């Protein structure tokens, strides 16, 4: 049935499939409320006015909102299957998302991307999958797969994709490197997402010549305003580690608010349960002083228009009937969720079922940890006088660079006194035996080791510890369980969580995953760790495109100067 066939319904000559009565329609176009009937047929909005329906629902004064949109996220950060993630966020109002699968792609390449696409397309939401642009994230990083322009061309020929995922290698862009520009040229008619932390001036100008449209790495009002003045959309990010909403709010005003939208980027299961998803960002924006209808507009209409999602993000004739029934605006209590006019969630519970076990389970995804034999000596810090140290910044994925010298003689065990831990990355895709070693200040671990197969973005094994023995056995346990997070102390495994899907994702329900992560977090806090999100923070210490100093399996990398640097300075 086409919209032409719906004309008699729009004109009031025939009954609509569904009519909401006595509701308050949130008009995001004008940031106001319309109190009229809302008619729906064939999955689209017919209009508002006086209508009769085959089914009529009395909303008793409840609000009707467009479905929420997450403009940029990595599903893998939720650490649960896609269907489990959907069952969590759809009842919270998220009906559209733009997902960049570069985590699973770094592990399993095309196989991983297609695995996500197959499952995501069988869920009642608008699933927009990007083609990752940076697999690996840089030319030197050691990932499990490489997606060059040729492979991307194969992917977009075989499947439907929304755009090119965040272009993180800005150095490759501004220096005109063919390996990244070939991908950009191939995807020039698609949405191209950005990753531009602190880029400004002529460097930003050069970066934007690639047709990059948006950025979610902006952290200050001045940075946001410059990027907007140069044509970018700003995805205000509120994840588990990086929380930029409060700092960016002063930049949003009546003249420029249409250039801002919401994104979660990376959110852990505990935070999805305790806080929520895009609904949490709306509530937080309102509490920080933003008008409720404007906050909803950022999460709906602004996102749809910025991303080029036609007939989404608003309540208007011909738009998709992706709707939320909201009890009140103060707490944003979501009573019901409708996708294409069909109820898919009610009272916080999903009304649909999808089982990924019904789909193929590729061995490259479910057996992805392959390490060479390791020794305690691999984690020994070489003797020296002055050391280069990663300086961790609380609640941020950016780091600083520091230097440390022992006041007298070298003694590895004394690093802990100065709030310094050892950190290493162990290559886990091709058993090369590569191990990069460094030091980090600010994590606070006083005893033992923490290892994880989640290490953005190449997802080798990252391990942080106070001693070589615990670091070794923690890494070996990761290999034994084929991915996960492991805590070791006093030469024993204390606890762990298994992440068998690419070493990134659990097969357990989100509640169980959240409980286990809370248990693990309590253990590491008892071992002295200070950071609020220890496992996600650790995972980002290996991302060599976010300043300043990061660790890879090839050693310490200075992101701003684009060079590997030594651990021992003299």
Swiss-Prot record:
InterPro entries: Adenine_deam, Adenine_deam_C, Amidohydro-rel, Metal-dep_hydrolase_composite, Metal_Hydrolase. It catalyses: adenine + H2O + H(+) = hypoxanthine + NH4(+). One of its GO terms (biological process) is adenine catabolic process. It comes from the Bacteria. Pfam families: Adenine_deam_C, Amidohydro_1. One of its GO terms (molecular function) is adenine deaminase activity. It is an enzyme of class 3 (hydrolase). Its cofactor is Mn(2+). Its EC number is 3.5.4.2. Keywords: Hydrolase, Manganese. Belongs to the metallo-dependent hydrolases superfamily. Adenine deaminase family. This is Adenine deaminase.
């Amino acid at each position: 049935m086409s919209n032409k066939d719906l004309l008699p319904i729009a004109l009031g000559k025939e009954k609509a499939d569904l009519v909401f009565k006595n509701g308050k329609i949130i008009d995001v176009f004008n940031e106001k409320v319309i109190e009229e009937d809302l008619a729906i047929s064939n999955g689209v909005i017919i209009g508002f006015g006086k209508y009769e329906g085959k089914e009529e629902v009395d909303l008793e004064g409840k609000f009707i909102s467009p479905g929420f949109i997450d403009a940029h996220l990595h599903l893998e950060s939720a650490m649960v299957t896609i269907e489990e993630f959907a069952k969590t966020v759809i009842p919270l109002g998220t009906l559209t998302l733009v997902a960049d699968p570069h985590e699973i792609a770094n592990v399993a390449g095309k196989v991983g991307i297609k695995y996500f696409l197959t499952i995501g397309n069988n869920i009642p939401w608008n699933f927009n999958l990007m083609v990752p642009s940076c697999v690996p994230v840089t030319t030197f990083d050691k990932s499990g797969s490489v997606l060059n322009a040729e492979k991307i061309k194969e992917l977009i020929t075989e499947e439907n994709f929304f755009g090119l995922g965040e272009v993180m290698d800005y150095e490759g862009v501004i220096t005109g490197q063919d390996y990244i520009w070939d991908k950009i040229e191939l995807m020039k008619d698609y949405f191209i997402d950005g990753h531009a932390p602190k880029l400004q001036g002529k460097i930003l100008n050069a970066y934007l010549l690639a047709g990059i449209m948006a950025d979610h790495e902006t952290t200050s009002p001045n940075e946001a305003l410059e990027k907007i003045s140069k044509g970018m959309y700003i995805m205000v990010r509120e994840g588990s580690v990086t929380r930029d909403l409060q700092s960016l709010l002063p930049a949003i005003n009546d003249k420029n608010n249409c250039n801002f939208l919401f994104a979660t980027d990376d959110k852990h299961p505990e935070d999805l349960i305790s806080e929520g998803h895009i609904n949490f960002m709306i509530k937080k924006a309102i509490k920080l002083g933003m008008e409720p209808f404007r906050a909803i507009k950022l999460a709906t209409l602004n996102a749809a228009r910025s991303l080029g999602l036609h007939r989404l993000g608003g309540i208007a004739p011909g738009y998709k009937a992706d709707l939320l029934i909201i009890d009140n605006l103060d707490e944003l209590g979501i009573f019901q969720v409708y996708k294409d006019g069909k109820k898919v969630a009610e009272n916080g519970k999903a009304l649909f079922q999808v089982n990924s076990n019904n789909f193929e389970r590729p061995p490259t995804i479910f057996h992805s940890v392959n390490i060479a034999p390791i020794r305690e000596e691999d984690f020994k810090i070489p003797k020296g006088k002055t050391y280069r140290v990663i300086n961790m910044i609380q609640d941020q994925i950016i780091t600083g660079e520091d230097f440390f010298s022992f006041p007298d003689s070298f003694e590895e065990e004394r690093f802990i006194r100065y709030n310094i831990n050892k950190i290493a990355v162990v290559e886990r895709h091709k058993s090369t035996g590569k191990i990069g070693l460094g030091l980090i200040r600010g994590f606070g671990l006083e005893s033992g080791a923490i290892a994880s197969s989640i290490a953005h973005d190449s997802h080798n094994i990252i391990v942080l510890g106070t001693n070589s023995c615990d670091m070794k056995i923690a890494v070996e346990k990761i290999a034994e369980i084929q991915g996960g997070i492991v805590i070791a102390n006093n030469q024993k495994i204390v606890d762990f969580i298994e992440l068998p899907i690419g070493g990134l994702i659990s097969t357990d329900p989100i509640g169980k995953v959240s409980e286990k992560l809370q248990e693990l977090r309590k253990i590491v806090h008892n071992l002295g760790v200070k950071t609020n999100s220890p496992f996600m923070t650790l995972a980002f210490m290996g991302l060599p495109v976010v300043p300043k100093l990061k660790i890879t399996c090839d050693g310490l990398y200075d992101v701003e100067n684009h060079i590997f640097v030594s651990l021992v300075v003299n």
